[in-house]
Amino acid sequence: GLESRELLSYLTDPSRKEYNKYTKTLKDADLVTVSIGSNDLMHLLNISGNIDEMISDNKEKFVRACRAFGETFPKIIRAIKKVAPDAVIVVGNVYNPCHGLESFQEVYQVADHYICELNQGYENVPDVLVADVFSAFHGSHEKLVNMAIRKDAIDPHPNARGHEIIAEKMLEKIQEEET
């Protein structure tokens, strides 16, 4: 997946090979859904060593990543609006993939803190509807992610039910806007 600065580059830098593909796709869009932000934090994780050390060693990096996202996200929305001025843009904020998973409890609270900080970057950005995926996942008693550790990486992606909930939250946000 992309980090927010990579997506911004794809949308704004004509020298990038992805630029034409992205702008061509967006040009005629009526609705744009965006899922961005989680990889801004995920790239800082190194689960091959001691979790406590990883967290303490990267604390300032997590803070900087959250701040940088808060600066980059509004630019992404402006770039999309520049290409597709009439499109409705819906974004799902970031959920905590460790929620409800017993084996990840030591990371859960720390992750929650930085995810909440990162999610502030979605607030007060004009021209975008924000679906509260974080609360939907946090309030659920269902398993919504395929959380797994493979080699030295974490797979935090939603399972089929998790994708359904994300879609439901985005649809609810669109319907709220229409009424």
For each of these PLM feature ranges, what is it?
Residues I55-A68, Y108-C116, A153-P156:
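A short acidic, glycine-rich active-site loop
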Residues P97-V133:
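Substrate-gating cap/lid alpha-helix
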